[in-house]
C-alpha cells in the first residue's frame, strides 16, 4: 500500500490518504462529509484523525474515522479518543478503480 499527500490525487499511485485535523465539535457533520467526499473523489481509503478535548473557546469531539473507497464508513471513533482498526481490502479497491476508471481522465501538472 502506498500513501501519498493530497496534491498527487490524479496519479492513482496511492491507496490511502491520511487527514489530520482540528475540526471543532460544532462542525462534526462537515468533517464527516468531507472525509466521505475525499474517499470517493480520490478512489482511495481515507483515514481521518481529528483532535479531541477542549481549549478555552472550543470543544473538539474527535470523530476520527476510516472511510472506504466508495464513501462507506469502515470504522468510526465517535466522541473522544479511541483506537480504530479496519481492514483495507486492496482487491476491492482495485476492482472499484477498474470499474470506474475516473483517474484516467486527469490532467497531470506541476505547481511552481
Please describe what each predicted stretch is.
Residues 1-2, 86:
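Generic detector of short, aliphatic-rich beta-strand segments that form the cores of beta-sheets
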Residues 51-112:
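C-terminal beta-strand edge segments of enzyme domains
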Residues 3-42, 46-48:
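Active-site beta-loop-alpha substructure in enzyme catalytic cores
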